[in-house]
Amino acid sequence: MSSASYVFAIVGTVTSIAGVSIRGAFPDLSIWLLIVLVMVVYALLTAVIRIYKLIRTKAGVQLRVNGNPVEIKVGDLFSCNGWKVIPFNEFYDTTVDNITISRHSLNGVFIEDHVDSLQELNSLIDKDAQTSLSPPKAAENGRLKFELGTLKRYKGEFLLLAFSHFNDLNEAHLTMSEYEECLVNLWREVSRVYSGIPVFVPLLGSGLTRFDESGWSPSKQDLLKCMICTLRTSKASFSAPITIVLTEGAFEETNPYDLKGWI
């Protein structure tokens, strides 16, 4: 809900409970003074609500899931100090051309701004065979296809995640059940490789990925709940905190505080 909606809701509720109108409360004021009064009250309430939301957003939400410390906060994933999870498709494609990979996606920003050599990255992806999951298989196009949830370490600060399928129409996609299975695999893989270092994860599935269920796509709140739920069911254990990093827009569309009563 926007700040304006909150203000109108508050004013409407108060006047309804009190059983008065603004005009009735100030019968001696001219209409112009009443308008000024309403604008001042509106501005003050809007400012208070925005300050409250800003403080709440910066503070984040702290949870414990199976004893694991988990934080949900707004931030820039790339500025976080620790392992940063970057979603790729199942082939670990690295071509940023706004067709295979969008320049504006986390995947695209990572490759263009944080990869020194694509040849080195591609070589690492092909040669790093350490995984608790199934080994990669050769697809019809001859490329290696990795199980969803597979992680590849890069530069000691990035965890590259095989997150989605990729079809001939250059669409990243998966079903909701595959999404859940991918997350369970992710948490178990993170537990294997994190080495006691904090891990930062974006809100997976909130970008360009398509869900195969016809006519339906999960809300950001659904995705957030699913990430927490799969962490719980994975039985993975961490000594360092797991942080789910949201954009400001995603934070506005979710209610992380609701998760405290849901866990």
Go through the PLM ranges and name each one.
Residues 1-263:
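Macrodomain-like recognition of ADP-ribose-binding/processing modules
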